[in-house]
């Protein structure tokens, strides 16, 4: 998958931000407390809507995405925030440095090389800091409901250009993050009641 081909037309937030924003913000606020500065790396920032929300809350945000159209829109809409074209195929920490938190919302389901993705996230963090990674939730009861309602072809469609190529569970995403060196991996399920959640948010800490 060539993620640079992702096309964006608007800086507005996607529908997923409606249910991801508040729990993600609360996780970050709890992690930072009163410490300053509050530097966040938004990996897979798209057209910048989530980075802009973070900046409005006082975070110093650097957004990176492989989509040139997304970054061009983000720079135009939110000129006070730093945005760059980049991907986990390169040494992001070597290029941009270390951060107090890394966010990556609804990205990991799109990547071909998830272990490389997790390693890049790990490298971007200062010791003792957290990554916040969201992805569509897939669990037993939700998958059963999808099958019983005959929605599998819609939910797992193969016809979406540049669509989801990985379907994560808490077990597999937790394993990915643990293999990368993260500790204290926890999950939140958001968007609906937990068994039918739209997405899950992994909070993982880099050891001190």
Where in the sequence are the language-model features?
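Feature marks short, surface-exposed loop/turn motifs that line or immediately flank catalytic pockets
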Residues: 128, 139-141
């Amino acid at each position: 998958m060539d993620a640079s081909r992702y096309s964006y037309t608007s800086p507005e937030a996607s529908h997923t931000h409606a249910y991801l924003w508040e729990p993600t913000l609360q996780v970050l606020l709890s992690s930072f407390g009163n410490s300053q500065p509050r530097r966040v790396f938004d990996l897979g920032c798209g057209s910048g809507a989530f980075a802009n929300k973070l900046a409005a809350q006082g975070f110093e945000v650097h957004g990176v995405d492989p989509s040139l159209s997304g970054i061009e829109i983000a720079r135009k809409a939110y000129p006070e925030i730093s945005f760059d074209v980049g991907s986990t195929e390169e040494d992001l920490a070597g290029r941009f440095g270390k951060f107090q938190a890394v966010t990556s919302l609804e990205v990991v389901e799109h990547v071909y090389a998830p272990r490389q993705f997790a390693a890049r996230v790990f490298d971007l963090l200062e010791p003792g800091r957290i990554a916040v990674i969201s992805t569509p939730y897939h669990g037993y009861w939700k998958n059963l409901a999808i099958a019983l309602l005959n929605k599998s072809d819609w939910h797992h469609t193969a016809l979406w250009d540049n669509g989801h190529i990985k379907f994560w569970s808490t077990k597999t995403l937790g394993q990915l993050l643990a293999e990368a060196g993260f500790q204290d991996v926890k999950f939140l399920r958001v968007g609906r009641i937990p068994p039918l959640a739209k997405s899950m948010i992994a909070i993982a800490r880099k050891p001190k």
